Amino acid sequence: MKTIKIGIAGGRGLSTVMGLKAIEGVEITAACDLNEDALKVIAKETGATKTYRVFDDMLESDIDAVIIATPMQCHVPQAIAALEAGKHVMSEVTAGVTMDELFWLCESVEKYNKTYMLAENYAYMPNVQLVKEMVKQGLFGEPYYAEGSYLHNCTDLLKYPDGKTSWRSYWQMGRRGSFYPTHSLGPVMGFFPGDRVTEISCFSPGTYNEFGVKQDSGTTTMCRTEKGKLINIRVDCTSPRPHNMSHYHLQGTKGVFETGSGKGDGDKIALLGEGNPIGCMHWEDISNYLEYLPERYKKATDEQNNAGHGGGDFFIVEDFINAIRTGEAPEIDVYKACEWTAVGLLSGISVANNGKTMQIPNFRKNMPLEEKIIKLD
C-alpha cells in the first residue's frame, strides 16, 4: 500500500493529527504557517520534517494531500492552488467566504479531478451517526423536520494574544446572518439522504453586544429542502452563555430524537410502538439504541476514540484517505460543502432584508447555468 504524504497548513489542522496518525499508510511530512512560533508547534505535534512559511512552497514538495486549516478567507484560494498542483484537499469549515468563491471551487474540483472534502467533523460524532443509521433503517418513519444549533461565545477570539485584531473579527463576527452554519446544518442533513436545501429565510433579534461587531446576537434560519422538508438552524457566537457545542433535533412520522440541551440532560429518543403509544410516549436514553451505532464506531480502538469527538475526528480523516485511495466521492464532497456554506452566506442578505427568502443555487455538475445563479423571489 502506497504511503500517502500529508501537508498541514495552519494551526487549526492539529485537530486532525491524532486521526491521521492512527491510519496505516499515512505520514505527515510537511507543515506550513506564517507564524514561525505556530509553525514550530505544528511541526512538533505532527512530526513533520519539512516546514514552510509560504503555502505555494509546500505545494512544490512531494505531498499527496493537504489539510487546509488556515483562516476562512484563505480556504478557497489555497484549495484551488493545491488542486492545480495535483494535491488532494481536506478543508476546514467553512468552504469559502463569498458566493463567487464557491462556484470557482466546484469548477476547480471538476477540472483537476482530485479529492476534495469538507472537514465538518460534527457530522461524524457518534450520536449523529447512530441516528443517521436509524433513519436509514426506517425507525423514525419519514423524517420531515430537524433543528441544529451551534451556541458558542467566540468574542474572546476577536483579538490575538498580542492585542491585534484577529481575522475572526472580520470574516466571522464582522458579518451578519448564520455566518458559520455547517456545525448546525451538516449533521442534520445526514438525516435527509439525497436531499439538499433549496431556499432559506433568516431572522435575528438584532445586535446586543458591547464589542462593536456586526454579527447578530443569534440568528434563526429556516431552510426548506428540495423534497419539502424543513430545517431550523440557530447560530449564536456573541451572547454570554456556556458553550453548548451542538444541539440537534429530528422529527419523523414514527419518532423523535433530541440531544441534551443543558447540564444533566442527555441524548434521547422516543419511537412509536406497543410500549410507547400515541398520547403516552416517553423518552429513552440513546444508550438503549447503541446497536445501531455503525460497526466501525463499535470497534474503534482507544487511539481512534482519543482523536476527538468520540472518534469522529478519526473517522472523518479515514474517509478522506479512503476517498483518495479508491477515487470515490467522499461523504462531504465539494457540492455539499458549497451548499451548506451558501446557506450561511445568503442568510446575511436575507436577515438584512427582513427575512427575505433566498434561493440556494444548485452547485451540482452539469447543471444548466440558470440553476447556478442567485435568484431573488
List each model region and its residues.
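N-terminal Rossmann-like dinucleotide-binding module
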Residues: 1-46
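Predominantly a Rossmann-like dinucleotide-binding segment in NAD(P)-dependent oxidoreductases
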Residues: 12, 122-213, 221-223
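Beta-strand-loop-alpha-helix segment that lines the small-molecule cofactor/substrate pocket
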Residues: 63-65, 71-72, 76-124, 138
